[in-house]
Amino acid sequence: MLDCHLYREDLERILSANLPWESLRGRRVLVTGATGMVGSLLVDTLASMMDDHGFELIAMSRNREELERLFSIHSDHEGFRMIEHDVNEQMDLSCDTIFHCASNTHPRLYSSDPIGTITTNVIGLRNLLEMASSGDGRFVFLSSVEVYGQNRGDVDAFDESYCGYIDCNTVRAGYNESKRVGEALCQAYGSQKGLDFVIPRLSRLYGPSMRLDDSKAMSQFLLNSARGENIVLKSKGDQFFSYCYASDAISAILHLFFHGESGNAYNVSGLDSDFTLADIAYELASMAGTEVVFDLPDEKERRGYSTATKAVLDISKVKATGWMPEVSMKDGLRRTVSSLASRL
């Protein structure tokens, strides 16, 4: 768990939701990608509830050192375990409730490890679906706004039925297409093996638990601001995207785990959180008392970047289930910068 009062406040906000935790009694819950931004906050949330509601929790990651650093605080929970494992490899493990958070999620890895980007969302997912299909629990596959591809110019915001353009004959398409295949694989297991699953499609995320090596533009802006540096913008900054603060994302994931309709996908985004990259860059520069500077990327770096220029999510469907985001963009940026500054 991060040693930061703002992170603990975020955790308390998530836990304040009235969710039917007792339905997890007797379950064994697995979180893959446990050391990532989403997985780590999800593990800390679940660990806070496991004793009172009688379920086991397994945090899985390829990085044992990070597991120990983040979660040794939970070692006093009798049913808590940390497992170092790559989901692409077969595993001798039985879990009936699974949150599949493991994935390459930033441009540098899309470019440098395109094979791993695809396999985690397909082969790793299949291994976990096989495990889940032998039980009667629920499976959560974290998908992404990236499944929509580029806006064709015919809508202002993507609902869950939208299908945009993806140039599939590129390295960068591996992330988008593997998330699409992953969703289809969940549907196949639901149809053929009766698996109960739900798919949150997350917008671009940020928050105190973000990794310091995250190469997404937004993450780099936040790190620049936390260090008191100029914000480095590697484009004109006119990309118009939806964003979501990490605690709102976890709140939505858990809400959909308990209340989402089986077999459905749901867009997840933040409170009043649709902005251009330039808007965010100038806001963070203002917070840090610095400036925005422009630095065009080289070819290798550019290969990992999204080509989308407008990716705004319509979250009417998830709101209809009773969930609402709580953290505004300005507040989320401020909280993230303050938290990151304490870690640097």
Predicted segment positions?
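Amphipathic terminal alpha-helices
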Residues: 1-22, 54-55, 329-344
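Conserved Rossmann-fold NAD(P)-dependent oxidoreductase catalytic core, especially the SDR/UDP-sugar
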Residues: 126-173
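Conserved beta-loop-beta element that borders a ligand/cofactor-binding pocket
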Residues: 144, 183-208
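Glycine/proline-rich active-site loop of Rossmann-fold NAD(P)-dependent oxidoreductases
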Residues: 152, 180, 196, 206-219, ...
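Mid/C-terminal beta-alpha module of Rossmann-like enzyme folds, strongest
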Residues: 259-302
